[in-house]
Amino acid sequence: MWTYILIFLMGMCLSGCSTTMGNYAEYSQKPFTQITATADLLRGVPDLGQEKITIAIYDFPDRTGQRKPSEKFSQLSTAVTQGPEVYLIQALKMVSDGDWFTVVERKGLDSLVKERQLVRSTRELYDGETSAGTVLKPLIFAGLIIEGGVVSYDSNMVSGGEGARVFGIGASKQYRTDQVAISMRIIAVQTGEVLMTISANKTIASYQAGADVFRFFDLRTKALEVESGAAVNEPTDYAIRSAIEYGVLKMVEKGEKLGYWKFKKWRVEE
């Protein structure tokens, strides 16, 4: 009697899991914008008490060379995104809702210059426009340059788990944390001096839990085996974005303390 009850309960659990996974698969196909916890901190930075700071980013590469971790075989896919400079530009434009930094294009400078040459030659050839009013505006030059990149990716920094089994019924859970580190330095264009350096680390958490049942019934002539589990892995890109945004936040705070820029002071009218 208990055997049939157990089989019925396991069937209900599996049907519930299949329904949940089906709904999740449908949801995962919809695009969404992932918001980090540090994004609100960047938007909440006080207003700048001077003219906007012009800053350039030529490259912010992955310097780790780390491949995706695998216990079975080596993978060709990289563990770190190959475009971290995109997140850095987004973070700079996010400071106080874009009121702090004017970010000039340098990563795609070749494409920008070619397009400007194409516009200029087309105007001269077909429109005959050579007057000063039709000349393209000069490119904005930056006063500061940010150099650096993703400098470290350490996998399996901390791992562990626990489990128990009684009369063929067991449950277990496992966890693992990786760590990614970024480093950036701010350079003055006029002198080439490194004004400050910033480093930030972010852990990447993974968690797995499962349960299983293995029982014999009908005088040990038949066996029942059921397994169920789920795993949650924090996206690597999310961790890199968080580390970069935190680095930009610390850069703003450190630069204000060193006197490179200042927060806007509000005057209370009497």
For each predicted feature, which ranges?
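N-terminal post-signal-peptidase region of extra-cytosolic proteins
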Residues: 34-44, 72-73, 85-88, 125-134, ...
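C-terminal/domain-edge helix-coil "capping" segments
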Residues: 18-51, 154, 161-162, 174-270
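Short, low-complexity, polar/charged sequence segments that are solvent-exposed and flexible
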Residues: 74-79, 122-125, 164-170, 203-206, ...
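N-terminal segment of the mature soluble domain
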Residues: 53-54, 58-156, 179-183, 187-196
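Sec-dependent signal peptide recognition
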Residues: 1-7
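Intrinsically disordered, low-complexity segments enriched in polar/charged residues with Gly/Pro
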Residues: 1, 171-174
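C-terminal motif of bacterial Sec signal peptides marking the signal peptidase cleavage site
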Residues: 13-16
